[in-house]
Every structure is written in C-alpha cells, then in structure tokens.
C-alpha cells in the first residue's frame, strides 16, 4: 500500500516475475504458500462466501470483515509490527479488511504471453528492439508461423532439410511423418520457436549496449551514403535512419532504468485487489460485477484448458496446443486492452467489456478522475464574468455558491449568536434565507480568502487567492486584469473556487497567493496584469469617429433647412448644428467638447500647421469638390482634408477632418514621444 507520507512519487514500468510473486505470496503456519489464483470462481452460490483459490479468495486477498476469518471466528487484530496471525483451519490472516484494497494475487500462465501495450501500441517497443516488422511479430505471437531456434554445435533435424527431395512448402507435411506425437513435441520444443516464447528468447538474447552500438554504426553508414537518383530509395533510407534513432533511444532508456526487455513477455499475470473490481448487489438482490472479473475468468478458463494437455496428456496434437496458446494470448490481450486488435469483446447485452486500459486511461480513468482530478469538499464551480468595479484582489461570489461553501461557518455563527439552538434549526434558517444569515455570511467572508483555479493549471498563477464579496446572479465576477494569469477569457470559461480551511493554507493564501501580489510573470519577470484588452477597446472607442463620409453633412446652399440652422459665432471657431465646425487649434476643439457643444465622435475641421504636414501625396490627389469665394480664394475639398489656396495658387492653410477622440489620441502620443526624447 502506498503511504502518502513516505512516498513522494509514482512510476509505472515493467516488473519482474519475482516482484509479482513478492506482492502476492504469503506463507501460512503450516508451510503452505498462497497467492496464486487457480480457479475462475468468485462466490459460492449457496453460502455467498468467496471460493477458495478463486478471484475473491480470503486466504489470498484477506478477510472481507476485519478480524473475522472464513470460518466465522473473530480474532483480535494484532499490531502490524507483530507476526501475522492466521486461522489454523481456513488459513485466513487476522488483519483489517482494508487489506483487500491493495493485496494482490497472480495467475501462473501455462505459456509466455506478450504484453499487448508493448507489441501493438505505436511505436511497438518489441518490434524496435527485435528489428523485425510488426506483422511478422504478430504472426509469431499468435502462432500463425514459427522459425528455427539457433542451436549452435548441435545436430538438428532442420539442418538436414537439404537431404530431402521435398519442396519447402511440403516440408511442414513431411516432418511429422518421421515422428510419433510424443517425439514431435520434443522436436518442437527443441528446434522450433513460436508464440510469445520466441519473442522472449529474442529479447533476452542480445545486450542492450550491443544494440545501441550496432544501430549507431548503421546510422553513420547510412549518413555517409550518397543520395540515390531514385526518390523511393532516399525515402527508404530516411525511414531507416529514423527507426535506428528510436531504437537507440529505447535501448538507452532501458539501460538507465535498469529494465530487462524480456519483461515485456509475461509469465505471471498480476490480479488486482478485489476492492478495485468489486461485486455489489443492486435492488432486488441481483449481483453486479466489474468487467475485469469476467475478463480474469476468461483468462483462467483458457489457461487451465492449456495446463491439462501439457501436464497430463502426452498424445495431444501440436496444432491443438498452439491453438490453445493463441486463445490464452487473446484472453490476456482483452484483459489488458479490449479492442486493440480489432473487434472488441462484448457481453450478452452487446456492451463492450471495460478492460484494464479503459479503467485507467481517459478523462474518466483512474488517474485523471480519481487521483489527479478529485472533487474536494468546500469547492464550487461557475462561469466567470467581468467585474470592472472590483478591486484587483477581490472577486464576486454568487450567493448560492457562497452559502454552500461557508455553510459550516454560518451555522457556527448562528449558534454563537443564539439565533439557533442546534445544527438542524440553523440549517432550516439557511434554507429559508433569513436576513440574519446574509449578515453572518458577510462577516465570515470578510476574514476568509478563497482560491480560484482555472484548468488546466499550467503554472502557479493558475491558482490565485481573492477576497470574496457577495454578488447577485450565478456567475463569478472577476477583475479583467487578472485574466492573463489564468489564461482565461470571458466567453463562457469556468473556474473552480476553493475554501482554504487550515491556518497554514489561509496564511499561504494571504501572504503569497493574493492576486495583487502576483503582478509579474514567474517565467520571464514581465508584468502579467496589464490592461491589454482594455487598452484596445478604449482606443477603438476613442477613434471610431463618424464613418458616414464627408458627403453626408456637407453644406448645400440649395437646401432650405440650412437657413434654419442656429449659428454660433466665436473668435476661435465657427460652429453650426448641422454643418461640421471649424477649429483653429486642438485646444479649442477640446474646450468645445468639455462645454458639450460637440460630441466625442462628431466630425470637425481642424486647422493644421503647414510645417506639420503629414498628409501624403497632397498635391497629386484629385479633389472631390472645389469651392470658390468672391475674392478669388478657393477650397479644394478632399475626403479627409481641405486645402485653402490663394489667387496665385499658393497654399494658405490646411484643414483636416477629424474628431475629438482622434485629437485626444494624437496628443497622448505626442506627449509620450516628447517625454521619451527628453529621457534619452
């Protein structure tokens, strides 16, 4: 069992058969060793007790009830440091029943079986180490063909194949004619290698260092070869070099972790603890079993069927034994990863069995849901929305979430203030949502921070502390400047809220995790709470202007409504309600805006100094319209500016068409540039 105080990490890898037996084996006082599961049964149908040496055996996995053995006798549970106590009649150890959550068993396989993860998963580790095609290895594992064993300095029957006049195809029919059935089994075991045993021999034979050195030499030789004219040959060389790189990396990894490659072939199959594959009774007394149990039973049935001809019968045909070995291999494959070889196995209701891989992988698997993504108490989850009026270190919690998170604190407050005499009355007042409840909740929240987390938590700013306040609605309100630390957007993102309970957690939240204390990125040190979106939206609003065009409000003397306009005369500007006003300087335009004579987006004409001309191609653009005055002065009107020229065609002045928002933006940029120039 993993002790959370002693173990800091968990590593998944290949284990040796000796380690598997050490997990499961126990020695009884009479010298008998238990741990091997040999029967495919679970519970007896009459007594409803676990079958001996079955998948739920109490001798192997421990008692169902603490201190009560299979005989029904109760014994005092001793200390873990003391020698274990066993029942002399049934052999069940007197320990706590929680041992059934971590005590394992094993199945001794009658033939070696390859681990399907290392054979069928891409890239195939077995294919990489053996340097053989995956299809060839699959045919070997599932007994579709075999090959001769390399027996050096020994006379073998297969070396005499040149003495026969038969063709290669007829040899498989001619060889059995020279042997009896018993002798052919000896011949097959001595000279023919097939099944997972052949894979095990290939993985155990070469040294990993030799594999690395040979792969490196071949990789260098391929790199020195000149490029062929055939494109297909060049691609073939590139694929071979990539394969050699993967092979060297795999061999080096196995050397670093001290893992023997032959462990990819199983001789012992571990059996999970019973509490991890339970059998429960639903309404009506009908039992419900985990799919793992049915897959284990299938393995044991086929394994026992193979054991009988290997141990008792000497006249079993070789093809029958090979076929049964194939069935054992397929049963173990289904247990480890159902459906990896094609069509998955289904039950009587056409439902796919959930294999060991299905239990641990995916979002609902053992790791992501149970170990990593456990739902904890005193936590909630909701959509986040913008709270621009909030302080940087505050967040808005909906009343519905806040009353659930701080319910225990509110109950304590109600009892202390003698509003409720017990917990039941306090809960009823909370359900009725009396005003005193919200008052106490406000006081509780003032001294208690909360933690907000957005998945995935990729760095430490994915969890930050905030001071909560009550808000209406059902969404969590968040200041927009803390968005970047969470990598969140206000487009439907959800965040989890947690309540730190211990004093250490509250102190850490206040001193280290408050959002106003995490203004810099922990990776590069740049400011992370910067108003990027706010600045863009502000600039857009400031410079949106009036996009209806110059021709919309142009003065038309033929229009009768122009004579009804109210004219406002001033020394600095001329302004009418319908016509676009003229200003001599930006200060005059801003003054008119402050006096609410013009709008932020109202188009206006601003006089521009000739020495500050920034308009490109001012003399090449064709004007939209030309207006003449009585003294010979004329105006060339363009889309965004107008030029006033004298009789001699000299430029008198220039007016640009803009808005108050554009003027404010320009002045801010101008001041920033001047400040930068003074600094440097």
UniProtKB/Swiss-Prot annotation:
<dbReference type="GO" id="GO:0009507">
    <property type="term" value="C:chloroplast"/>
</dbReference>
<dbReference type="Pfam" id="PF04997">
    <property type="entry name" value="RNA_pol_Rpb1_1"/>
</dbReference>
<dbReference type="GO" id="GO:0000428">
    <property type="term" value="C:DNA-directed RNA polymerase complex"/>
</dbReference>
<feature type="binding site">
    <location>
        <position position="71"/>
    </location>
    <ligand>
        <name>Zn(2+)</name>
    </ligand>
</feature>
<keyword id="KW-0804">Transcription</keyword>
<comment type="similarity">
    <text>Belongs to the RNA polymerase beta' chain family. RpoC1 subfamily.</text>
</comment>
<keyword id="KW-0548">Nucleotidyltransferase</keyword>
<comment type="subunit">
    <text>In plastids the minimal PEP RNA polymerase catalytic core is composed of four subunits: alpha, beta, beta', and beta''. When a (nuclear-encoded) sigma factor is associated with the core the holoenzyme is formed, which can initiate transcription.</text>
</comment>
<feature type="binding site">
    <location>
        <position position="87"/>
    </location>
    <ligand>
        <name>Zn(2+)</name>
    </ligand>
</feature>
<keyword id="KW-0934">Plastid</keyword>
<keyword id="KW-0479">Metal-binding</keyword>
<dbReference type="InterPro" id="IPR034678">
    <property type="entry name" value="RNApol_RpoC1"/>
</dbReference>
<dbReference type="GO" id="GO:0005739">
    <property type="term" value="C:mitochondrion"/>
</dbReference>
<dbReference type="InterPro" id="IPR045867">
    <property type="entry name" value="DNA-dir_RpoC_beta_prime"/>
</dbReference>
<dbReference type="GO" id="GO:0006351">
    <property type="term" value="P:DNA-templated transcription"/>
</dbReference>
<dbReference type="InterPro" id="IPR000722">
    <property type="entry name" value="RNA_pol_asu"/>
</dbReference>
<feature type="binding site">
    <location>
        <position position="493"/>
    </location>
    <ligand>
        <name>Mg(2+)</name>
    </ligand>
</feature>
<dbReference type="Pfam" id="PF00623">
    <property type="entry name" value="RNA_pol_Rpb1_2"/>
</dbReference>
<dbReference type="GO" id="GO:0003899">
    <property type="term" value="F:DNA-directed RNA polymerase activity"/>
</dbReference>
<keyword id="KW-0808">Transferase</keyword>
<dbReference type="InterPro" id="IPR007080">
    <property type="entry name" value="RNA_pol_Rpb1_1"/>
</dbReference>
<keyword id="KW-0150">Chloroplast</keyword>
<keyword id="KW-0862">Zinc</keyword>
<feature type="binding site">
    <location>
        <position position="90"/>
    </location>
    <ligand>
        <name>Zn(2+)</name>
    </ligand>
</feature>
<dbReference type="InterPro" id="IPR006592">
    <property type="entry name" value="RNA_pol_N"/>
</dbReference>
<feature type="binding site">
    <location>
        <position position="491"/>
    </location>
    <ligand>
        <name>Mg(2+)</name>
    </ligand>
</feature>
<dbReference type="GO" id="GO:0008270">
    <property type="term" value="F:zinc ion binding"/>
</dbReference>
<feature type="binding site">
    <location>
        <position position="69"/>
    </location>
    <ligand>
        <name>Zn(2+)</name>
    </ligand>
</feature>
<protein>
    <recommendedName>
        <fullName>DNA-directed RNA polymerase subunit beta'</fullName>
        <ecNumber>2.7.7.6</ecNumber>
    </recommendedName>
</protein>
<keyword id="KW-0460">Magnesium</keyword>
<dbReference type="GO" id="GO:0000287">
    <property type="term" value="F:magnesium ion binding"/>
</dbReference>
<dbReference type="GO" id="GO:0003677">
    <property type="term" value="F:DNA binding"/>
</dbReference>
<feature type="binding site">
    <location>
        <position position="489"/>
    </location>
    <ligand>
        <name>Mg(2+)</name>
    </ligand>
</feature>
<comment type="function">
    <text>DNA-dependent RNA polymerase catalyzes the transcription of DNA into RNA using the four ribonucleoside triphosphates as substrates.</text>
</comment>
<dbReference type="InterPro" id="IPR042102">
    <property type="entry name" value="RNA_pol_Rpb1_3_sf"/>
</dbReference>
<dbReference type="InterPro" id="IPR044893">
    <property type="entry name" value="RNA_pol_Rpb1_clamp_domain"/>
</dbReference>
<keyword id="KW-0240">DNA-directed RNA polymerase</keyword>
């Amino acid at each position: 069992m993993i002790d959370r105080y002693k173990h800091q990490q968990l590593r998944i890898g290949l284990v040796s058969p000796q380690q598997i037996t050490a997990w499961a084996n126990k020695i009884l006082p009479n010298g008998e060793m238990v741990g091997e599961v040999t029967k495919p049964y679970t519970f007896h149908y009459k007594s409803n007790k676990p079958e001996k040496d079955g998948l739920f055996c109490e001798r192997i996995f421990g008692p169902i009830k603490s201190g009560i053995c299979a005989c029904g006798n109760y014994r005092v549970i001793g200390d873990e440091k003391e020698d274990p106590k066993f029942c002399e009649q049934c052999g069940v150890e007197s320990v706590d029943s929680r041992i059934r959550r971590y005590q394992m068993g094993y199945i001794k396989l009658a033939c070696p079986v390859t681990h399907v993860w290392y054979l069928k998963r891409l890239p195939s580790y077995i294919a990489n180490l053996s340097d053989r095609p995956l299809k060839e290895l699959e045919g070997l594992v599932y007994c579709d063909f075999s090959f001769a064993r390399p027996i050096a300095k020994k006379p073998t029957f297969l070396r005499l194949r040149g003495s026969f006049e038969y063709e290669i195809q007829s040899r498989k029919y001619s060889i059995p004619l020279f042997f009896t059935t018993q002798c052919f089994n000896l011949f097959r075991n001595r000279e023919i290698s097939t099944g997972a045993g052949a894979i095990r021999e290939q993985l155990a034979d070469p040294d990993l260092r030799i594999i690395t050195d040979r792969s490196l030499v071949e990789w260098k030789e391929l790199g020195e070869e000149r490029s062929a004219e055939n494109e297909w040959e060049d691609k073939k060389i590139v694929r071979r070099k990539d394969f050699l790189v993967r092979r060297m990396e795999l061999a080096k990894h196995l050397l670093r972790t001290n893992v023997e490659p032959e462990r990819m072939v199983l001789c012992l199959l571990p059996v999970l603890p019973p509490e991890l594959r339970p059998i429960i009774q639903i309404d009506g007394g009908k039992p419900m079993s985990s799919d793992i149990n049915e897959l284990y039973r299938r393995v044991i049935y086929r394994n026992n069927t193979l054991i009988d001809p290997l141990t008792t019968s000497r006249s079993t045909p070789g093809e029958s034994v090979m076929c049964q070995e194939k069935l054992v291999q397929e049963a173990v494959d289904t247990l480890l990863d159902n459906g990896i070889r094609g069509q998955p196995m289904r039950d009587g209701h056409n439902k796919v069995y959930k294999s060991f891989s299905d239990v641990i992988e995916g979002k609902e698997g053992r790791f992501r849901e149970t170990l990593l993504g456990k739902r904890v108490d005193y936590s909630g989850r909701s959509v986040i929305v913008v709270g621009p009026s909030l302080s940087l270190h505050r967040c808005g919690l909906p009343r519905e979430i806040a009353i659930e998170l701080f319910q225990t604190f509110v109950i304590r407050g109600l009892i202390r203030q003698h509003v409720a005499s017990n917990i039941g009355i306090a809960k009823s007042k909370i359900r009725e949502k009396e005003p005193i409840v919200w008052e106490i909740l406000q006081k509780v929240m003032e001294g208690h921070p909360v933690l907000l987390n957005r998945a995935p938590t990729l760095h430490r700013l994915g969890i930050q502390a905030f001071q909560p306040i009550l808000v209406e609605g059902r969404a969590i309100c968040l200041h927009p400047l803390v968005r970047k630390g969470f990598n969140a957007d206000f487009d439907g993102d959800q965040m989890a809220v947690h309540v730190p309970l211990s004093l250490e957690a509250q102190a850490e939240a206040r001193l280290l995790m408050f959002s106003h204390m995490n203004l810099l990125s922990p990776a590069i040190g740049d400011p992370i709470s910067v108003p990027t979106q706010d600045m863009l939206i502000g600039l857009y609003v400031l410079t949106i202007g009036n996009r209806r065009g110059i021709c919309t409000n142009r003065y038309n003397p033929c229009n009768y409504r122009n004579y009804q306009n109210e004219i406002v005369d001033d020394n600095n500007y001329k302004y009418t309600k319908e016509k676009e006003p003229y200003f001599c300087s930006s200060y005059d335009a801003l003054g008119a805006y402050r006096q609410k004579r013009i709008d932020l987006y109202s188009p206006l004409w601003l006089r521009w100094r000739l020495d500050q001309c920034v308009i490109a191609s001012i003399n090449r653009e064709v004007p939209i319209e030309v207006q003449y005055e009585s003294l010979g002065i004329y105006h060339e009107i363009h889309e965004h500016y107008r030029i006033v020229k004298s009789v001699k065609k000299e430029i008198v002045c220039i007016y640009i068409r803009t808005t108050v928002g554009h003027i404010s933006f320009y002045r801010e940029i101008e001041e920033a540039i001047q400040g930068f120039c003074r600094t440097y």
